[in-house]
Amino acid sequence: MMTCAAILLAATFTRPLERVTTMDPALAQSVYESRAVQLAYETVLAIDYVARPYQLVPGACELPEVSEDGLRYVFRVRSTELTAGEIVRSLERLRDPDLVSPNGWMLKSVDTIKALDDRTVEIRLTQKCHFFPWLMAMSQTGIRKTDGSGTGMYELSSWWKNHEMVFTRRKADADGGFDTIRYLVVDDASTKWLMFLKGELDFLAEVSRDNWDAIVDEKGNLDPKLVAQGIRMYSNSTLESIYIGINMRDPILGPNRKLRQALNAAFDYPRWEKFYSGRIVPSTGPVPPGIDGRLETPFAYSFNLEKARQLMVEAGYPNGIDPKTGRRLTLTLAIGRASQDTREAGELVAAFYDRIGIRLELSFHTWNAFLKAVDEGRVQLFNMGWVGDYPDAENFLQLFHSKNVSPGPNHANYVNPAYDREYDLAMGAATAEARNRHWWKCQEILREDCPWVFTHFNLANSLVRPRVGNYIPSCFPYGQECHFKVIDK
């Protein structure tokens, strides 16, 4: 007979997660915050958990009625716990000047948001926006009731900041979902792995480089010993674009395009791929493979050491030497955590740039301090990632529009009127074909200006223990635990 403690443990799903700094949907920025927010808050619309290609389904509201000109959206409230007024207030918080949400860019095409009655919301746009419904499925549209609480599947019952978050189910589930969700902050990758092996963690969203060889055999398949325990491994592509951002406001890097091109050409992707055990895809721009509108032509500044050295000469730093001082050019790379993996990755990047004479200093920060420094433009180079919020090239290309400079998502503070013009033309295009022509031009401009060092796109390799059912890999994993089922109670 199971004890009460054993039953409680069996109905609890535990996974590691990076630090969450806010549970306010309007302030959530990281993928980790988005995961937590969607457990506790319903979004206006939702992304189907099963369907591929991805498609939208009702959330707090039914799918919208859209006017013929694409400028008027009418949402009928579906949730019995929310009113149209609460939905309007929650969305308006995204552009509240007193709150200063970093997600205000989501409403840049919105004119008015009104409650027509208690069960109907009307949103009018200033210009047609083909992906607008997808924005309404993002975590940042999580609806807060008047008292600030949510109406999601779970509610936050305890939060020991920087250590643990516990969510308890608030909605009945006859299909056998987990009663409790625990997020644990575990910084050390080896500790995560040992906890997973001992059954203290039910899920690993990623496997560290150091532990990879212990997980797979020589063919890259899951080790038979793990298979015998019922452990499952899932490998899938993601919409996670990883890059080294270049602050265009920096007096050294901003005006010197040749120097930025050299940083790209010196980035040794074959060595980088080996460092990550082949679990990445090369990046030749910001738009991931598989997304309509991605530019597929070769990147002129892919790894080429000889070319990088010549670009350093053209940039005014032959062999990395600043002729004004006679000393090596020194740049600083800001990194948002100090784990073993990030330290080793940073040291490898420093080795790449040492080959062209640049001395790269690594500056490690806590995640909060890092985000603040990036938002305020107090960094020179910074290691960052962007996970697609919806499957559209625009979601990645808006990261470079001048309207979105920090504290918006354009953390590189890239400003180019020619780029803005092509982007705006794409947004107003009548067909996908016409839109893609402008997206391709945007990417051509970016590839020449190099406001990022384009490093890679992540591949996801998840490990799931046998007691967890109904796990489906997704590029949009926010709130996915709401769909999990308990197999071994």
Question: Residue spans of the language-model regions?
Answer:
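Gly/Pro-rich hinge or "lid" segments in bacterial periplasmic/extracellular proteins
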Residues: 46-51, 125-182, 190, 305-306, ...
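Structural transition elements
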Residues: 250-255, 282-317, 337-344
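N-terminal lobe/hinge region of extracytoplasmic solute-binding protein
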Residues: 16-68, 89-92, 149
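Ligand/substrate-recognition segments at binding pockets and active sites
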Residues: 15, 161, 282, 315-388
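Ligand-site clamp/hinge motif
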Residues: 170-218, 359-361
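Surface-exposed binding/hinge segments that line
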Residues: 76, 102-145
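Aromatic- and charge-enriched surface segment that lines or borders ligand/interaction sites
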Residues: 63-99, 122, 192-198, 253-255
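Detector for C-terminal structural segments
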Residues: 17, 32, 242, 264-296, ...
